[in-house]
């Protein structure tokens, strides 16, 4: 092994160490990391600078004099008085050049050590308590970005203190400003008797560098306690409309279903978070889960927002109600098991017209929609496919859509065979068209919560059981099920991992007459009654169940929406998705 000489520097030591690294089966990654680090050119340059500085410290050079500039001026004055020889004129010209004068000025500055900052003298009338406090001068360099800190007035001492540090902001990156620090001056302006909003305005107007005079907090907060919690927002939020937020400029707006990375939960009222996928590295303020729940509970109590039990529900997507039609499971001459008319045939008769409908009371109806903790999930080979749940507004024709997709690939897709109490017809087979059971057995299953949905049509009971869905999934098929939105809460379990797709019809305003020219204005006619019902149905689902929806498909025609649906289902086995954290634990 080569031996280093006593005069070898750190740079040569690192070079030799890099050449001596050998891969080890147990520490291959660590060895690779060290080799990459030691081979970096930037590290080599730093080592050379380090050696130069160490050499300088060992030599300890001292200046011959501390006023070279003054000496040069004296020499120039003598030469100007008697400038005869050419050498004297050349020396005078050389000493007069700006570059040499600048070098001499730098020499004097270094020799006199005038490069250290000089603090202003303390005022004569300063109190004794202030003299005992350690004052810290902090200079931050920032662009047009905010400082990344909020301030408040301490109720007991009246001092202006730092209330919070925004993760990723200028103050956080500096590591010099902490929660609890007392702010005394901003760019030489005292802030002892100014309001927090006046101080914020001074900070906002400061561009480039900003100098703060602060008194450090007695107990420094733990700045690096990252929570690394991912939350899906179940509501829309705009800090400009929130009067409770301590600083609107520090707020983080987000949309429903957007995933947020919560980086700090130190404040029980206001969390700090970032939008996942956002290029902005600075965190913003969002209401905490507890605070948002209290606000929603208060608004619900006072009637500001309606209670779920009192919602007026419009019609959802309805199946065909004819006894003989292509909805009976036949598609292009082939029969597909389970593709029968939905049990909601009876619901169509009962819900015709506008009437007050109570949303089923359950755990979901009492939940205050704030945040849902999520984690990344990717389907693994050999794992059961996720349940694909279709919900549709009026006019979506889900049964037709489901029928087309399953019939085109029955080996890959399947549907749950429903239960019924009606008598079996001569051409029907048990477990193919329906599971035929007695009314007593059907009602017993209802009592044991075995049905996802159930209803009555012409004095016969129809229903889709959870067991029927499990049977399809056990065959390694993608199970398609269409339900009313209220039933989604029964399916949101780790077993099913449902992917919810909302299908709504395309609604376009009709023109009275074709326009004469492209520039002519021809107002569209209002939506007819049927289109208004479709629009109201879609708006209701989006407003009250949008937090449960993963994808929205707009049905222009059957072929296009089928292609979109198949593409979405295909991506479920390839892409990574955010799901409730309870589904992956």
UniProtKB/Swiss-Prot annotation:
GO terms for molecular function: PDZ domain binding. InterPro entries: GK/Ca_channel_bsu, Guanylate_kin-like_dom, Guanylate_kinase_CS, L27_C, L27_dom, L27_dom_sf, MAGUK, MPP3_SH3. Residues 226-296 form the SH3 domain. It is found in: Apical cell membrane; Cell membrane; Cell junction, Adherens junction. Its main location: membrane. GO terms for cellular component: adherens junction; apical plasma membrane; cell-cell junction; plasma membrane. The gene is Mpp3. PROSITE patterns: GUANYLATE_KINASE_1, GUANYLATE_KINASE_2, L27, PDZ, SH3. Participates in cell spreading through the phosphoinositide-3-kinase (PI3K) pathway by connecting CADM1 to DLG1 and the regulatory subunit of phosphoinositide-3-kinase (PI3K). Stabilizes HTR2C at the plasma membrane and prevents its desensitization. May participates in the maintenance of adherens junctions. Residues 385-570 form the Guanylate kinase-like domain. Residues 137-218 form the PDZ domain. The modification Phosphoserine is found at residue 307. Residues 510-530 are annotated as: Disordered. SMART domains: GuKc, L27, PDZ, SH3. This is MAGUK p55 subfamily member 3. Interacts with HTR2C; this interaction stabilizes the receptor at the plasma membrane and prevents the desensitization of the HTR2C receptor-mediated calcium response. Interacts with HTR2A. Interacts with HTR4. Interacts (via PDZ domain) with CADM1 (via C-terminus)Interacts (via PDZ domain) with CADM1; this interaction connects CADM1 with DLG1. Interacts (via Guanylate kinase-like domain) with PALS1. Belongs to the MAGUK family. Pfam families: Guanylate_kin, L27, PDZ, SH3_2.
């Amino acid at each position: 092994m080569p031996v280093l000489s006593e005069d070898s520097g750190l740079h040569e030591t690192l070079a030799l160490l890099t050449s001596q690294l050998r891969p080890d089966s147990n520490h291959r990654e660590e060895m690779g990391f060290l080799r990459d680090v030691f081979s970096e050119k930037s590290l080599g340059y730093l080592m050379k600078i380090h050696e130069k500085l160490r050499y300088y410290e060992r030599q300890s050079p001292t200046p011959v004099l501390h006023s070279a500039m003054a000496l040069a001026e004296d020499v120039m004055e003598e030469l100007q008085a008697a400038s005869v020889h050419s050498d004297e004129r050349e020396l005078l010209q050389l000493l007069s050049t700006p570059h040499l004068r600048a070098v001499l000025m730098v020499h004097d500055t270094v020799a006199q050590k005038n490069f250290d900052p000089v603090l202003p003298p303390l005022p004569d009338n300063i109190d004794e308590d202030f003299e005992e406090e350690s004052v810290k001068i902090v200079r931050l360099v920032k662009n047009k970005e905010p400082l990344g800190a909020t301030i408040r007035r301490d109720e007991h001492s009246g001092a202006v203190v730092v209330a919070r540090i925004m993760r990723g902001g200028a103050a956080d990156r500096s590591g010099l400003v902490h929660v609890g620090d007392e702010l005394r001056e901003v760019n030489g302006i005292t802030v002892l008797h100014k309001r927090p909003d006046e101080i914020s305005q001074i900070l906002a107007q400061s561009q480039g560098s900003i100098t703060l005079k602060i008194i450090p907090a007695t107990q420094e907060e733990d700045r690096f306690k990252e929570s690394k919690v991912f939350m899906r927002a179940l509501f829309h939020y705009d800090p400009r409309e929130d009067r409770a937020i301590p600083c609107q400029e520090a707020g983080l707006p987000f949309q429903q279903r957007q995933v947020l990375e919560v980086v700090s939960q130190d404040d029980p009222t206001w969390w700090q978070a970032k939008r996942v996928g956002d290029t902005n590295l600075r965190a913003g303020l969002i209401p905490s889960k507890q605070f948002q729940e209290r606000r929603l509970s208060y608004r619900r109590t006072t009637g500001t927002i309606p209670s779920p039990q009192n919602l007026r529900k419009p019609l959802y997507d309805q199946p065909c109600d004819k006894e003989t039609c292509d909805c009976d499971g036949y598609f292009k001459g082939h029969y597909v098991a389970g593709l029968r008319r939905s049990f909601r045939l009876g619901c169509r008769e009962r819900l015709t017209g506008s009437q007050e409908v109570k949303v089923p009371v359950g755990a979901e109806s009492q939940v205050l929609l704030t945040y849902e903790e999520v984690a990344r999930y990717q389907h693994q080979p050999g794992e059961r496919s996720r349940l694909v749940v279709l919900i549709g507004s009026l006019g979506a024709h889900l049964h037709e859509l489901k029928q087309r997709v399953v019939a085109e690939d029955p080996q890959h897709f399947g549907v749950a065979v429903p239960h019924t109490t009606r008598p079996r017809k001569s051409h029907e087979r048990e477990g193919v068209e329906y599971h035929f059971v007695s009314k007593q057995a059907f009602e017993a299953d209802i009592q044991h919560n075995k049905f996802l949905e159930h209803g009555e049509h012409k004095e016969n009971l129809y229903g889709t059981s959870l067991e029927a869905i499990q049977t399809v999934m056990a065959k390694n098929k993608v199970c398609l099920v269409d339900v009313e939105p209220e039933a989604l809460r029964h399916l949101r379990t780790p077993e099913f991992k449902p992917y919810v797709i909302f299908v709504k019809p395309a609604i376009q305003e009709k023109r009275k007459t074709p326009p004469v020219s492209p520039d002519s204005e021809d107002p569209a006619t209002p939506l007819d009654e049927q289109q208004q019902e479709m629009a109201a149905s879609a708006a209701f689902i989006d407003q009250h169940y949008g937090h449960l929806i993963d994808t929205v498909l707009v049905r222009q025609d059957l072929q296009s929406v089928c292609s979109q649906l198949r593409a979405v289902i295909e991506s479920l086995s390839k892409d990574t998705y955010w799901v409730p954290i309870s589904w992956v634990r």
